[in-house]
């Protein structure tokens, strides 16, 4: 009865192909950050500890309702904003490099967490920048840059 949307945080793989890990690894290595499209497409990211709390709330819930319950963060950021924030938080000199947007890439991804709020009393608590800082620290360790 649940669905986790766009998780991020420590434990991500270096080469998993996801936006957050790709951008952080590129910035920490001093590489330019690759953006597909013009960077205006939006995404929502939920820190892993928030998702774990949501899963636990779902398992412990005795609420009787129908639906999948979206666990995610409704805060929406453009890909360009995320890249610039990661560059700043990493203290990197990376620049943005733009490539064509794949045809099947959606312009927007944002979860509706209404059921999670109403039936589980759950919503994410970790702000994007706080989660990014922790994830950057994790990747510094993975890359041996600590």
What is each model feature region?
Residues 1-5:
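Single conserved hydrophobic/aromatic residue that forms the stacking wall/gate
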């Amino acid at each position: 009865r649940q669905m986790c949307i766009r998780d991020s945080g420590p434990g991500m793989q270096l080469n998993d192909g996801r936006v957050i890990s790709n951008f952080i690894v590129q910035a920490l290595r001093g590489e330019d950050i690759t953006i597909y499209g013009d960077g205006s497409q939006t995404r929502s990211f939920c820190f892993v500890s928030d998702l774990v709390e949501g899963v636990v709330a779902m398992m412990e819930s005795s609420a009787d309702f129908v639906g999948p319950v979206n666990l995610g963060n409704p805060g929406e950021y453009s890909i360009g904003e995320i890249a610039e924030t990661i560059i700043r938080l990493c203290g990197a000199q990376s620049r943005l490099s733009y490539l064509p947007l794949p045809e099947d890439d959606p312009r927007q991804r944002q979860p509706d967490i209404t059921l999670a709020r109403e039936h589980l009393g759950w919503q994410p608590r970790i702000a994007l920048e706080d989660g990014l800082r922790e994830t950057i620290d994790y990747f510094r360790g993975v890359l041996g840059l600590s």
